[in-house]
Amino acid sequence: MIVKYGGNAMKSVELRRAVAGEIAALRAEQPVVVVHGGGPVIERELAARGIASEFSNGLRVTSPQAMAVVEMALAQLNKQLSQDIGAAVGLLGRDSELLVAEVLDPALGRVGRVTRVNAGLLRTLLGVGLTPVVGCVAVGPDGDALNVNADTAAGAVAGALGEGIVFLTDVDGIYRAYPDPESLASQLPRAEVEAGIRDGWIAGGMIPKVRAALEALDAGAPFAVIASGMQPGVLAAAARGEAGTRLTP
């Protein structure tokens, strides 16, 4: 199974370690690959160096200077997560061309879209009982680093491996009328997801998550769930279909 982890769910050290413990427990039942972003950490490191953050359609505009900081921040976070999980191998997507990407839009700078996943490397690590922990820096056509969206990268990994994926975020799932708890959807077919985007009840940062989830399903992932990473015990429940919102083709 693929676990996409990032955002507010990793702001607290205590919460990060709790999620790491859940990942370690889940690993006893099935192989797990962790794909992570690092928005809050990247923001902090950029601000400390006086580099302004700029976004376009939810994607970070990434200059070569900012890319160096992004890669450094993700490498540090990757090491921390790997240590928290235990029996894990921390990798950035550039390592062994694990994630290969093309430039998404020259106007965004060093921002890419994953075009190939080194699934063989991941299967080799899983085969010897290790948990790959993947930070979202890909290798571009020129061999240099590209910043890739963690949601879409995780979806690409799920599709390449043909495994289910759980996106951990800071809400319990997808709401038809947020924050009404009664409107939390336990399951959404593609047609209703598209309607939700069109009608505005799926918006903002949730859009790339649902797009990535649908792309993962199209590529062969058997399931995709969006669930909260802010509460203990959710990960295993989401994997069983008992928490979050499960997207279906």
Curated annotation (Swiss-Prot):
GO terms for cellular component: cytoplasm. It comes from the Bacteria. GO terms for biological process: arginine biosynthetic process via ornithine; L-arginine biosynthetic process. The record marks K4, K209 as: Transition state stabilizer. The keyword Cell cycle does not apply. Pathway: Amino-acid biosynthesis; L-arginine biosynthesis; N(2)-acetyl-L-ornithine from L-glutamate: step 2/4. Substrate binds at G38, G39, R60, N147. It is an enzyme of class 2 (transferase). It catalyses: N-acetyl-L-glutamate + ATP = N-acetyl-L-glutamyl 5-phosphate + ADP. GO terms for molecular function: acetylglutamate kinase activity; ATP binding. The keyword Endoplasmic reticulum does not apply. Keywords: Amino-acid biosynthesis, Arginine biosynthesis, ATP-binding, Cytoplasm, Kinase, Nucleotide-binding, Transferase. It is found in: Cytoplasm. It holds the Pfam family AA_kinase. Its EC number is 2.7.2.8. Belongs to the acetylglutamate kinase family. ArgB subfamily. NCBIfam families: argB (TIGR00761). Catalyzes the ATP-dependent phosphorylation of N-acetyl-L-glutamate. This is Acetylglutamate kinase. The gene is argB.
